[in-house]
Amino acid sequence: MTRTRLLAAVVAFAMPVAAVAAGPVLMHRDPGCPCCEKWAQQVKAQFGRAVRVVDDANRPAFMKARGVPADLASCHTAIIDGITFEGHVPIADMKRALATHPKGVTGLAVAGMPMGSPGMEMPGMKTQPYDVVAFGPGGRKVFAHH
């Protein structure tokens, strides 16, 4: 682990939750998607605030407006403190992005719905490996691998 990553992890976990996510949590989802509810419950528990859920039949337009690359699409898009989180992004990765605000990054995404990612946990099912991808005007890069 690089010193920068270690420092970012320490900062992310040492900060009070309220300082990490000062603004409201807004989540647009495909209407009626149950895994989005599971993910929102985890966000609520970890950030200590309600998640405003919007059933959005026109979510692709919302995603495009937020700069989410089409190939990174999932079933929900959340906004916290101006950062976009597409799909089943783990809470620890969200906290790290919110604490460090990586230069040129406007959001994080987990493409699709990988088994075992937050909200997609199912007893007896094998966890699939997946990447959390940081995206922004300058392109994209892997932010974390799970």
Q: What is the role of each PLM region?
A:
Residues 32, 39, 55-58, 90-94:
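Stable alpha-helical elements in mature extracytoplasmic
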Residues 1-7:
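Twin-arginine (Tat) signal peptide motif
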